[in-house]
């Protein structure tokens, strides 16, 4: 489990690197975590999402080697992994190391240059929190390889796709493209309105005025592979097949609300209908959120966050008692104008939009009430909106 630290020091990491790998020059990189403001479980349904990069994430130091060996070490986890570039395969015992291995393999398979490296990473994104520790690590490695071996000339969107492919095909976890996109393409004080179908995107300035986005960690770990994530994807595919009897589309999110309402009679299974309803309406909420933030209408934006959570709870059924408790308690506190779960669900984190002057009281009340309901306390992190992966 990653130990939470509010600030990572690159100089400390450099010293650790020298202890492990010896004296010499090195290059240093940072890759953020991400939070999706709204638009949950629709990235794999061709929908719009609205993520931003955080100002905490994963630091990495790297040095080129003269051979084909890659050494991976972390300050967070004792496990060290060494691989040969000519023989990269998934090995369960390599744990976290499979994420960098997957990215390296995908880049090699594309015919791009990769050489031997000594790498040390240090992250402060809690594992299983839903803040994209895996995408942060994947893009850290991808941008390292781009800058060190390819003069920074590789297309960033291609690196995003290769990182997603590494997680899907090499590690074997289903994920949409949003996490990698937000981590790589984030800009300070901007959210990204991303069409996951076409990868068209535009930036929206996020001016929260007297409010702050607070991340609330239920402290219940979320395991993607153990969750019902894959089951939900299959249910959405069922809905899509049924809709396709009348209207040929590639993704549910291609439907407008009016089109969906006129075609939903094709879906007889109530559970499958609920999943599809969430997807289509959530996609509309994202577009409205973009508009509301551009007008700085924070109160209405906050209401959309709550609507999103209730839909994820009642229609998509991916919240669970911990997320429902923390969001419910947040919405009951004066000064909070919106809250919702983020990530895949079944644990992990939620976000709340809270008045800055009431933040300390908010955290105290939510923490105490959550503890009464669940039996242990949550964690709180406040982050600014930061830059995508970069070389320091």
From Swiss-Prot:
Residues that, per the record, bind substrate: 40-43, 229
Enzyme Commission designation: 2.7.1.6
Annotated compartments: Cytoplasm
Site residues by UniProt (Transition state stabilizer): 34
GO molecular function, one term: galactokinase activity
Catalytic site: 179
UniProt KW keywords: ATP-binding, Carbohydrate metabolism, Cytoplasm, Galactose metabolism, Kinase, Magnesium, Metal-binding, Nucleotide-binding, Transferase
Positions contributing to Mg(2+) binding: 134, 167
Pathways involved: Carbohydrate metabolism; galactose metabolism
InterPro entries recorded: Galactokinase (IPR000705), Galactokinase_bac (IPR022963), Galactokinase_CS (IPR019741), GalKase_N (IPR019539), GHMP_kinase_C_dom (IPR013750), GHMP_kinase_C_sf (IPR036554), GHMP_kinase_N_dom (IPR006204), GHMP_knse_ATP-bd_CS (IPR006203)
The UniProt record lists the keyword Cytoplasm: yes
GO cellular component: cytosol
Similarity comment text for this entry: Belongs to the GHMP kinase family. GalK subfamily.
Name of the protein in its database record: Galactokinase
Organism for this UniProt entry: Clostridium tetani (strain Massachusetts / E88)
